[in-house]
């Protein structure tokens, strides 16, 4: 603070010196003009220009908008000394106004000297805290295990026979099912081993028990035979199937009777089977449950596994060679085959021991960077790779407590060795064996601590030195007892969500960062306070006012009374009531100057004017005892209100803002780092496929198999229609089959002829039953009736008027022609009614001969058909007819002759 006052004094002094050197000496300004007593002439030499007198502090000026210092007025000598002094006073007032209004809230304080009524002391240094940190940080690699929810899967083979009994009633043109009975029968063990697996055939009969009664079904209601197994038409990706028949057998047709038909279809099907913990049962892909452990058997103590069936229903075959029913190839290596018969089917599968076929834990994550830290009574395993933190106890977890956990140690060692060889083989060494911890949420952590090669060498050297210092006959420390093998086993249940571990990791991440940051802040703050306390204890001896004001939090005055400080409260003074004088020289003592600028102030706006001296940090001193010898080159900056005043050669020069002075920071940097960004990646304990596959029964697979069963083992495209002639053909075929080879040959011919006749009749019947065929037949009948009607009319017309019927055009021309031209030449024709009688007689004769020729030809044709005698008789008759004389009579006139002539 004193440095600032000294600079201000130097500035004012320099300004006064510059003004004094440029202006002549002048009398002091009257106090009444400004209410301020100011020195107008500098001691030690003439002044060509009096320094400007500052304006009263009560005058308010407008607020400055720029912080650049105003240019100094040019030192041109005015024509009048009084005018020069007035101009200098105005300039100084303007500068002071700008300084005051730059920071309007800057207060001046009058601090009376303390009397010792109030004394204070400083607190002693405190003991700084230590920030909390984790203990026993250990780096290493880890393998995280979770509960194995996947079922145990294996292949099984089903043997069963589909029995279908259908009751059909046959009508004349249709058939109707009156009932269909369907059932499944198991295949006996002997037939599976001796027939199906050895020869690839199956018996056509099915013997099974229903309602505690044994029954037998015969395929096609015939005697027992061996039927060959053939591959199913449709094979899935996971299973194959074989069967003996495609079509259902229907009974022969007998109209108006109920008939029964039996179909036995032997089916062998490979299916997937699955079983879940505790493996007391398994289910097939068809949806059939088997209430027996898949590990049940008669070897290696497996008879203790669960079963719900009688002993005679189960059979275990050692040295079983399975056969591929498609290629007929035999397996190269034998297996132990389990066979179980149920009321509906027989199932077979390869037996394997329970250990190590199944494991209740499975590997989840392999973490190549895992940090273990001890917090209180727990371990926290954190990994940035998977953004999780696992919390465990400080004690290790024994693997012997895990039921069916043989795979944990094996898989953990393999994964740890693989990660170590890939990343840490050249830089680290393993510390001991893998350690196992059970984390919250059901996660088992296999942790392998690591140590860098450098630290390992240091530890080895230290260990060797400790061994050298120990006595030779020291008793070795007892080894830790191995965990008891009789400890109760349990199954670890793993939660399906990892969010709690993610939240724990986030909390630990934030907690570690915040605790570290707050710890550094607390330590730095405490140390800083202790350092400042030492400085304050020393600084209070130099400037007790500043130290006391900073400590109390408000402006006070203080002085040391031994080891304590006496303080008194300072009185604030409004900035408008304070003015600074332009000279720092003591007029009555040449060579002596004030070290701080002189000021005049009022406590109140209308109060009396008090002379004083500007102290440090806007303090107004009531005395003017701050003196110093005048020096050459004096320059000082003093805090005045919200800015600085500059004195040069103990005279006011100009003003400037605080921003124009370079600031040197005295703060201690606080090491606070921002929380680093961390992105969470999706992390699933169990994938969607694992959750879907965790159930004992896959309903999708069951429905798919049930709906695909008919497509695989039945012919759905062949249709057997109702046929009334089927019984007849079946009887004929059976009749000719019983007559040997000759009967079969004759039967083929007869069957062909009968088939043709039946086909023709069936074709006509089908054509007539068709609506379009019936319409065509109706149209043909109608056309025949119309033709018969016209033929009948023609015959009637021919009988009534043959000439008109035979020669309609000729008769029509004769009717329309001139009757006079028809008679021909001469008058005889005219007299005879227009007709020539001779020609008419010739026409009649021609017609008679035509009838005679027709009769002779018919007689000869009939005689040729009858024989030689008839032909001779016909010849004689013809000769007689040719020799016959003409008739000797004259034609009689018909009474209708006139009508006939009209028609002609």
From Swiss-Prot:
Q: Per the record, what ranges lie on the membrane's Virion surface side?
A: 23-771
Region Hydrophobic membrane proximal region, residue ranges:
716-769, 728-768
Major location, coarse class?
virion
Enumerate the residue ranges of region (Disordered): 40-83, 467-490, 816-835, 883-904
Transmembrane domains' residue ranges: 772-792
- Where are the compositionally biased (Basic residues) regions? 60-70
Detail the disulphide connectivity of this chain as listed in its UniProt entry: 111-570, 128-526, 202-266, 359-407, 593-630
Q: Which UniProt keywords apply?
A: Disulfide bond, Glycoprotein, Host cell membrane, Host endosome, Host Golgi apparatus, Host membrane, Host-virus interaction, Membrane, Signal, Transmembrane, Transmembrane helix, Viral attachment to host cell, Viral envelope protein, Virion, Virus entry into host cell
Where are glycans found on this sequence? 82, 136, 393, 425, 486, 671
Q: Where in the cell is it found?
A: Virion membrane; Host cell membrane; Host endosome membrane; Host Golgi apparatus membrane
Question: Subunit info?
Answer: Homotrimer; disulfide-linked. Binds to heparan sulfate proteoglycans. Interacts with gH/gL heterodimer.
Function of the protein:
Envelope glycoprotein that forms spikes at the surface of virion envelope. Essential for the initial attachment to heparan sulfate moieties of the host cell surface proteoglycans. Involved in fusion of viral and cellular membranes leading to virus entry into the host cell. Following initial binding to its host receptors, membrane fusion is mediated by the fusion machinery composed at least of gB and the heterodimer gH/gL. May be involved in the fusion between the virion envelope and the outer nuclear membrane during virion egress.
| Name the record gives this protein | Envelope glycoprotein B
Source organism of this protein record: Human herpesvirus 2 (strain HG52) (HHV-2)
* Gene designation: gB
């Amino acid at each position: 603070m004193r440095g600032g006052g000294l600079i201000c004094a130097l500035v004012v002094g320099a300004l006064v010196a510059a003004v004094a050197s440029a202006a002549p000496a002048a009398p002091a300004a009257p106090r009444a003009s400004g209410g301020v007593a100011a020195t107008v002439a500098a001691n030690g030499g003439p002044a060509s220009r009096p320094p400007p007198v500052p304006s009263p502090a009560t005058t308010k000026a407008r607020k400055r908008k720029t912080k650049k210092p105003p240019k100094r007025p040019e030192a041109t000598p005015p024509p009048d000394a009084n005018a020069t002094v007035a101009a200098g006073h105005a300039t100084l007032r303007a500068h002071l106004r700008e300084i005051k209004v730059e920071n309007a809230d800057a207060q001046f304080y009058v601090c009376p000297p303390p009397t010792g009524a109030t004394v204070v002391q400083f607190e002693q240094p405190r003991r700084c805290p230590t920030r909390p940190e984790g203990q026993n940080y250990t780096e290493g690699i880890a393998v995280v295990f979770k509960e194995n929810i996947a079922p145990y899967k294996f292949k099984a083979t089903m043997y069963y026979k589909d029995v279908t009994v259908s009751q059909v009633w046959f009508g004349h043109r249709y058939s109707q099912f009156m009932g269909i009975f369907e059932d499944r029968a198991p295949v006996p063990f002997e037939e599976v081993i001796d027939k199906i697996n050895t020869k690839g055939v199956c018996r056509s009969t099915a013997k099974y028990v229903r309602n505690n009664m044994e029954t037998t079904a015969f395929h096609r209601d015939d005697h027992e035979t061996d039927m060959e197994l053939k591959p199913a038409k449709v094979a899935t990706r996971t299973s194959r199937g074989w069967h003996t028949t495609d079509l259902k057998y229907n009974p022969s047709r007998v109209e108006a009777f109920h008939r029964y038909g039996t179909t036995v279809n032997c089916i062998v099907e490979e299916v997937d089977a699955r079983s879940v913990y505790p493996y007391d049962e398994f289910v097939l892909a068809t949806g059939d449950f088997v209430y027996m452990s898949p590990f049940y058997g008669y070897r290696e103590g497996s008879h203790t596994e669960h079963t719900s069936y009688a002993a005679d229903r189960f059979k275990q075959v050692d040295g079983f060679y399975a056969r591929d029913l498609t290629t007929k190839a035999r397996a190269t290596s034998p297996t132990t085959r389990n066979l179980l018969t149920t009321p509906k089917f027989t199932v077979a599968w390869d037996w394997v021991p329970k250990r190590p076929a199944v494991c209740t834990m499975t590997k989840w994550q392999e973490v190549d960077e895992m940090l273990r830290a001890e917090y209180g009574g727990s371990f926290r395993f954190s990994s940035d790779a998977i953004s999780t933190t696992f919390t465990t106890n400080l004690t290790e977890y024994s693997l012997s407590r895990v039921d069916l956990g043989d795979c944990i140690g094996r898989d953990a060692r393999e994964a740890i060795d693989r990660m170590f060889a890939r990343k840490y083989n050249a830089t680290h060494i393993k510390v001991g064996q893998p350690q196992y911890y059970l984390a919250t949420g059901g996660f088992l952590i296999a942790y392998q601590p690591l140590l860098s090669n450098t630290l390992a060498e240091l530890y080895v050297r230290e260990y060797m030195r400790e061994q050298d210092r120990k006595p030779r006959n020291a008793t070795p420390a007892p080894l830790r007892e191995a965990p008891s093998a009789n400890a109760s086993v349990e199954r670890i249940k793993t939660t399906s969500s990892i969010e709690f571990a993610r939240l724990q990791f986030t909390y630990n991440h934030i907690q570690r960062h915040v605790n570290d940051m707050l710890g550094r802040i607390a330590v730095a703050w405490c140390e800083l306070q202790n350092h400042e306390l030492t400085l304050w204890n020393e600084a209070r001896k130099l400037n007790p006012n500043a130290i006391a004001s900073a400590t109390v939090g408000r402006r006070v005055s203080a002085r040391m009374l031994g080891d304590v400080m006496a303080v008194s409260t300072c009185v604030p003074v409004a900035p408008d009531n304070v003015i600074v004088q332009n000279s720092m020289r003591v007029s009555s003592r040449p060579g002596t100057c004030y070290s701080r600028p002189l000021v005049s102030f009022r406590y109140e706006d209308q109060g009396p004017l008090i002379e004083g001296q500007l102290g440090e940090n806007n303090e107004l001193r009531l005395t003017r005892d701050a003196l110093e010898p005048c020096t050459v080159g004096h320059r000082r900056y003093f805090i005045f209100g919200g800015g600085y005043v500059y004195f040069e050669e103990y005279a006011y020069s100009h003003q400037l803002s605080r921003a124009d002075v370079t600031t040197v920071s005295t703060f201690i940097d606080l090491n606070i780092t921002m929380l680093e960004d961390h992105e969470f990646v999706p992390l699933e304990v169990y994938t969607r496929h694992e959750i879907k596959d965790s159930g004992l029964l896959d309903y999708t697979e069951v429905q798919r198999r049930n709906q695909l069963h008919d497509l695989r083992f039945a012919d759905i495209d062949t249709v057997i229609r109702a046929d009334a002639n089927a019984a007849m053909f079946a009887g004929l075929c059976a009749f000719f089959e019983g007559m040997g080879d000759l009967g079969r040959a004759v039967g083929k011919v007869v069957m062909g002829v009968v088939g043709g006749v039946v086909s023709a009749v069936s074709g006509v019947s089908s054509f007539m039953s068709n609506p379009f065929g019936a319409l065509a037949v109706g149209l043909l009948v109608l056309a025949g009736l119309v033709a018969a009607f016209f033929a009948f009319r023609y015959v009637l017309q021919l009988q009534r008027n043959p000439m008109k019927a035979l020669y309609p055009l000729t008769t029509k021309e004769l009717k329309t022609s001139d009757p006079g031209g028809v008679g021909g030449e001469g008058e005889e024709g005219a007299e005879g009614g227009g007709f020539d009688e001779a020609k008419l007689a010739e026409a009649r004769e021609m017609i008679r001969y035509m009838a005679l020729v027709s009769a002779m030809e018919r007689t000869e044709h009939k005689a040729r058909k009858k024989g030689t005698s008839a032909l001779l008789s016909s010849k004689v008759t013809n000769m007689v007819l040719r020799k016959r004389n003409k008739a000797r009579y004259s034609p009689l006139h018909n009474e209708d002759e006139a009508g006939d002539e009209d028609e002609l």
